[in-house]
Curated annotation (Swiss-Prot):
Family classification: Belongs to the TrpB family.
One GO MF term attached to the UniProt entry: tryptophan synthase activity
Organism, scientific name: Phenylobacterium zucineum (strain HLK1)
Described function: The beta subunit is responsible for the synthesis of L-tryptophan from indole and L-serine.
Protein name: Tryptophan synthase beta chain
Residues recorded with modification N6-(pyridoxal phosphate)lysine: 99
EC number: 4.2.1.20
Gene3D superfamilies per UniProt: 3.40.50.1100
Length: 406
């Protein structure tokens, strides 16, 4: 099959049907269509409203703490001996990751729509914490669905959500991880349509979510562009970010998609190795199919049953990828690499020791591919890596990997 041709303007996507080429769309039951149409119309109106955008910008500045710094990682750069490495410090946001950018946008939209109850799904717990945080700020009840396996491995975040007033509902069905949490949240939404807003955390799901989450996260790329021009007087040679559903990555990538000189790299979770079948690399180890309302690359068996994803990182442990990433892969605009659990843990240790920054295990997957990427762009090159979250939540996981008791 021939690869689809590259578009003249990446900003023109998705189309009116919510599609990025063959991907995306609205594969949802009839009962959900009125909700999806209502949400799409409300978002389009908010997007075009300067008052909404000004209110969001105000909260991002004074509550979230934006702009986040673009930091030159001098010792890491020296260690690899190649291109200059800059880190976009999303882990310095309020709540410790990029997730709050999207939550703030969506909570303002929910209020605008008159919704009085918020539900969300979470994997690593970062989106759950960010959702619980904005719900506390605006005085709205919050229910967070979380796979029972993730509840176990992310106890600090579960406690943080409880402290913020959210109810965390463990999900035991399926693999008891993010996919199953999303299934339960969708069931809740259909049942409680009149008052409930479903605040999806990733650039996945049915249209308009992939577009909406991307738009709220694109502040990352817009700031990066401004900051790198100020620091270096030119655009970077490459961007790199970890990809599960892919919201942090698309937030960094999107404002640069029309700049053909900028190479784009996403890094999927290879778990124990793509060849072992125990991984979460939807593009490198999956094929197109439909899940959670959209067409995208998925981990599935020969008859199309969704297979369990595996990653040491709860935030990347999802059997699919956002539809815009699937399309960027097919048209050749972005390259999707992989990093194993072991490589990510090694990168976690390296950044901690060289720069005094504990990265989230999710972000560590992107860090693991820096040797190849810095080599590819050369000694005079510039690489920007999105440090999507902080690693405080992962110290227990890292300790057990190192055979240490905390």
């Amino acid at each position: 099959m021939n690869a689809p041709s590259r578009p003249n303007d990446y900003a023109a996507y998705p189309d009116l049907k919510g599609r990025f080429g063959d991907y995306g769309g609205q594969y949802v039951p009839e009962t959900l269509m009125p909700l999806v149409h209502e949400l799409t119309a409300a978002y389009e109106a908010a997007k075009a409203d300067p008052a909404f955008q000004a209110e969001l910008a105000g909260y991002l500045t004074h509550y979230v703490g934006r702009p986040s710094p673009l930091y030159f990682a001098e010792r890491l750069t020296r260690h690899y001996g190649g291109a200059k490495i800059y880190l976009k410090r999303e882990e310095l946001n309020h709540t410790g990751s990029h997730k709050i950018n999207n939550c703030m946008g969506q909570i303002l939209l929910a209020q605008r729509m008159g919704k009085t109850r918020i539900i969300a799904e979470t994997g690593a717990g970062q989106h759950g914490v960010a959702t619980a945080t904005v719900c506390a700020r605006f005085g709205l009840p919050c229910v967070v669905y979380m796979g029972a396996v993730d509840v176990e491995r992310q106890k600090p975040n579960v406690f943080r959500m409880n402290l913020l007033g959210a109810e965390v509902r463990p999900v035991t069905s399926g693999s008891a991880t993010l996919k199953d949490a999303m299934n339960e949240a969708l069931r809740d939404w259909v049942t409680n349509v009149h008052d409930t807003y479903y605040l999806i955390g990733s650039a996945a799901g049915m249209h308009p979510y992939p577009m909406m989450v991307r738009d709220f996260q694109a502040v990352i790329g817009r700031e990066t562009r401004e900051q790198i021009l100020e620091l270096e007087g030119r655009l970077p040679d490459a961007l790199v970010a970890c990809v599960g559903g892919g919201s942090n990555a698309i937030g960094l990538f999107h404002p640069f998609l029309n700049d053909s000189s900028v190479k784009i790299f996403g890094v999927e979770a290879a778990g124990e190795g793509v060849e072992t079948g125990r991984h979460a690399a939807a593009i490198n180890g999956g094929r197109p199919g439909v899940l959670h309302g959209n067409m995208t690359y998925l981990l599935q068996d020969r008859v199309g049953q969704i297979e369990e994803a595996h990653s040491i990182s709860a935030g990347l442990d999802y059997p699919g990828i956002g539809p815009e990433h699937a399309w960027l892969h097919d048209v050749g605009r972005a390259t999707y690499l992989t990093a194993t659990d072991t490589e990510a843990l090694e990168a976690f240790r390296l950044l901690s020791e060289l720069e005094g920054i504990l990265p989230a295990i999710e972000s560590s997957h992107a860090l693991a591919r820096l040797p190849e990427i810095t080599r590819e762009v050369g000694k005079d090159g510039i690489v920007v890596l999105n440090l999507s979250g902080r690693g405080d939540k992962d110290v227990n996981t890292v300790a057990s990997y190192l055979g240490r008791q905390i």
